């Protein structure tokens, strides 16, 4: 079974991202706008219980933090992804690191660049046109993040929440 760990931002930020994603992101229907903390990994139902207990401990060790959108950016020329760049503040980076320990699987397929995808898999010409238009716009947004989510992938490719972990809370 495939799992991942992500932050879902506020409805306001999700609505903003979706206004672009429905036109420019082929994965629009598979998962809501999110900030990936840990990329897709495979696990058994039995092992995910152990992982869930570790995530609970991680969530208690971190306080809510500010998520700040800085601007529109891209991963070009590596791949055609347009995203809202998220400030890589200390709390967010530390949380990301805490989710990549030996117990949770250290492998990080990419350098952590906090972002919220708004377009991907676009042909080069369309990618450059869209990026040019969006670069002229201001994307400034701040909000408090107080939770992260363990997600799992359904057979049809969509992602759904398996469990939610509140930051700084002891339950």
Residue ranges of each PLM-predicted region?
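Basic, often amphipathic N-terminal segments
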Residues: 1-66, 74, 88-142, 159-171
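Charge-rich, low-complexity N-terminal segments
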Residues: 79, 85-86
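Short proline/glycine- and acidic-rich turn/helix-capping motifs at secondary-structure junctions
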Residues: 70-78, 117, 147-158
């Amino acid at each position: 079974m495939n799992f991942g760990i992500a932050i879902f931002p506020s409805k306001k930020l999700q609505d903003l991202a979706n206004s672009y994603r429905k036109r420019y992101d082929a994965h629009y229907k598979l998962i809501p706008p999110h900030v990936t903390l840990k990329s897709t990994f495979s696990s058994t139902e039995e092992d995910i219980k152990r992982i869930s207990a570790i995530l609970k401990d991680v969530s208690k060790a971190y306080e809510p933090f500010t998520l700040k959108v800085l601007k529109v950016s891209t991963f070009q020329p590596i791949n055609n992804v347009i995203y809202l760049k998220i400030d890589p503040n200390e709390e967010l980076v530390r949380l990301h690191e805490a989710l990549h320990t030996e117990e949770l699987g250290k492998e990080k397929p990419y350098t952590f660049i906090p972002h919220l995808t708004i377009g991907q898999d676009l042909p080069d010409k369309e990618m450059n046109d869209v990026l040019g238009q969006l670069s002229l716009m201001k994307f400034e947004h701040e909000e408090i993040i107080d939770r992260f989510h363990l997600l799992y992938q359904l057979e049809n490719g969509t992602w759904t929440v398996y469990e939610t972990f509140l930051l700084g809370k002891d339950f």
